[in-house]
Amino acid sequence: MVLTRLVAAGKLERIARGVYSLPGRPLSEHRSLAEAALRVPRGVVCLLSALRVHGIGTQAPFEVWMAIPHHSPTPLLDQPALRVVRMSGTALTEGIEPVEIDGVKVPVFNAAKTVADCFKYRNKIGLDVALEALRDGWTQRKLTMD
């Protein structure tokens, strides 16, 4: 009830169900990632979206790529557009680093795991994207060959 009044008074802006923002707040490039993280609490930003966060490659996905637990129901979101990748065990829990976007701590796979996952899921994103990610990550010194 209080949130409804604040929205009606123009002191808050409703972005999505359960997600509010201050009006006039500048939009960041990764705002959709913060929205998705709030609406999919067990999800982790992965693959093309994680490459974009790390500044690797030239891919600019129009969907938010998120990894969710294997047996979780698929989140039904109208906005932002979501692309779900199912993972389980250590594939889902290892290599997560929180990145703050618009005041929200968003779980994102680190650069090395993201590039490795690009090869694992090359049938979804394409081998050319995986090779570009490896080349660009190595050139930018964001990856090591340990």
Q: Where do the PLM segments sit?
A:
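Nucleic-acid-binding surface
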Residues: 7, 13-145
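Short amphipathic alpha-helical interaction segments
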Residues: 1-8
